[in-house]
Regions:
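Conserved acidic residues
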Residues: 41, 142, 213
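Conserved proline-anchored active-site loop of SAM-dependent methyltransferases
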Residues: 44-50, 133-154, 182
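Conserved P-loop NTPase motor core
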Residues: 45-46, 210, 225
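Short hydrophobic/aromatic beta-strand or adjacent loop that forms the aromatic wall/cage
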Residues: 227-232
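Flexible, glycine-/basic-rich loop-and-beta segments that form/coincide
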Residues: 233-240
């Protein structure tokens, strides 16, 4: 929390950066290859509303442009649970997120809600629908992010969500490009059954390893040291 006003002033932001914003910025500074040096950069962010990851990427690119006297055109696309979908309101009432930056209202064509218009990445048809949009519009994504990782005691549902974001990011990522995904370690010592989920977790990490030339595990200094939160970065997707 102490960092937020400092960063707001340092980068002359018209908003206060969130914890998610700060953590992703730190990851990008640690592994700067994530953001290519092309003149045109395209990203897709899953589970993104209200837009903290995109705002963090935007600032990172802007600061790099200032440092190297370059000019980069940044185009983002995003996915999230659709706050205007009645299905979402009934199915996920606890996960609705407001349009803090008015990015949904001002850029409706940038938001990919999928085939059923819910934005639910646990529906495979929605992932396929996003892929079709990207392919049909000849969009070459430089980076795919996902902020869907959660911690909690509902292990089976969390595993389904983590698997969905893994499949989604891998499938949507362009060959030779990168992903960054928020995850949580599976073991919660207060929950006995969580120890049994380690096999699933290792298998999920192995899936990433099969699909990328390298994978990195990083825990930002700005992340709660007592939490199992970490970020997985997939470097150069293989042609799979």
């Amino acid at each position: 929390n102490n960092l937020k006003p400092i960063l707001k002033k340092k980068f002359n932001l018209d908003y206060t950066p969130s914890s998610a914003w700060i953590k992703l910025y730190e990851v990008m500074k640690t592994l700067p290859f994530m953001i290519s040096k092309n003149n045109n950069i395209y990203t897709l962010s899953l589970a993104e509303a209200p837009g903290h990851f995109m705002k963090s990427i935007e600032t990172f690119i802007h600061q790099r442009d200032i440092k190297y006297k370059t000019k980069t055109n940044y185009t983002w696309y995003a996915n999230s649970l659709n706050p205007y979908s009645q299905i979402v309101r009934k199915r996920y009432p606890d996960f609705l997120i407001g349009d803090t930056f008015s990015l949904i209202r001002n850029y409706p064509k940038r938001w990919l809600w999928g085939k059923d218009n819910t934005g639910d990445i646990m529906n495979p048809d929605n992932i396929r629908h996003m892929k079709k949009f990207i392919t049909d519009n000849n969009i070459k994504l430089d980076l795919v992010t996902s902020d869907a990782g959660l911690a909690g005691d509902d292990l089976f549902d969390l595993q389904k969500l983590e698997y969905a974001q893994a499949i989604g990011t891998i499938y949507l990522c362009s060959p030779n490009k990168h992903v960054v995904i928020k995850h949580f370690t599976p073991i919660i010592f207060e929950i006995k059954d969580s120890i049994d989920s380690t096999g699933y977790f290792v298998s999920l990490m192995y899936l990433y390893a099969l699909c990328f030339e390298k994978i990195y595990f990083t825990k930002p200094n700005s992340s709660n040291k007592k939490s199992g939160e970490f970020y997985l970065v997939g470097y150069k997707k293989k042609d799979v």
